Regions:
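Conserved N-terminal segment of class I S-adenosyl-L-methionine
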Residues: 1-121, 170, 176-178, 207, ...
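S-adenosyl-L-methionine-dependent methyltransferase catalytic module, highlighting the catalytic core
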Residues: 113-115, 122, 126-127, 131, ...
Length: 252
């Protein structure tokens, strides 16, 4: 009879290179990760900011990769957890990790731009490490707000530049220039070619920009428990024009 640990090790190898490191019955899936025991090391820094008891709650994990955060949510008692990604390799890894952990989690091949197809609003939506991989990050935030976020929204993005924030005035004179030179002004850096040898890294915000994007999409920031992580609540848009109304007109 085959050793269960040997079977897990064989299957982990078959599933290719892992980005999420798990301990699956003693088998590490990404023991040489350049970020260390990732994403466990990051999770430890903001786990306290997520409700410990998710009994009866639904969770959507957007860009779930191998399902680390989906599994953490299930461990906290979430009734329904759905993870979506567009990379079938990662989804296969996620299904295997959930199976080894004895958890029922639904993993689907679905883009963030198609979340309306879920036809469901979730009590908690995770958006971890996705924004900077998207060609259209604000559109993604708008779609999440419109179609799937019922209450809590936890977002994480790689950040570069200044970590300081400023109170941005509601309007600027046409001839104003100096404010845009300030390091703390919201900035979204465009990566034309590659970052960290990854051609899918398109944008890198500074902290002021990430916060502003979240607010612009209709999310009220409740907590900032980790340098890249923001816990938000869905709010009503307060601007003079709801950009989603324009989007609906365009797509009709």
């Amino acid at each position: 009879m085959n050793d269960p640990e040997d079977e897990i090790r064989r299957r982990v190898a078959e599933l290719g290179q892992w980005f999420h490191n798990f301990d699956l019955c003693g088998v590490q899936t990404a023991p040489s990760h350049f970020l260390g025991d990732y994403p466990q090391v990051k999770w430890q820094r903001f786990a306290h900011a997520i409700p410990y008891d998710l009994s009866g709650k639904s969770v959507l994990d957007v860009g779930c990769n191998a399902g680390f955060y989906s599994i953490q949510m299930k461990e906290r008692g979430a009734e329904r957890v759905v993870g979506i990604d567009t990379d079938e390799k990662y989804l296969d890894q996620a299904r295997f990790a959930a199976k080894v952990n004895g958890m029922e989690i639904e993993f689907r091949n679905l883009s963030v731009y198609r979340v309306a197809e879920l036809r469901e609003h979730f009590d908690l939506v995770l958006f971890m490490g996705v924004l900077y991989h998207l060609r259209h990050p604000l559109l993604a935030l708008d779609l999440l707000h419109e179609h799937v976020v019922a209450d809590l929204f936890v977002a994480q993005s790689m950040l570069r530049g200044s970590r300081q924030t400023i109170d941005v005035p509601p309007d600027f004179d046409f001839w104003e220039e100096d404010v845009f030179e300030g390091k703390s002004f919201p900035r979204l850096y465009f990566v034309e070619k590659r970052f960290a040898n990854d051609p899918t890294n398109w944008w890198i915000p500074n902290q002021a920009c990430f916060e502003a994007m979240l607010r612009s999409a209709g999310f009220a920031i409740l907590d900032h428990p980790e340098c890249e992580v923001f816990v938000c609540r869905r709010a009503r848009l307060t601007g003079p024009v709801d950009p989603r109304e324009e989007l609906r007109e365009i797509t009709r």
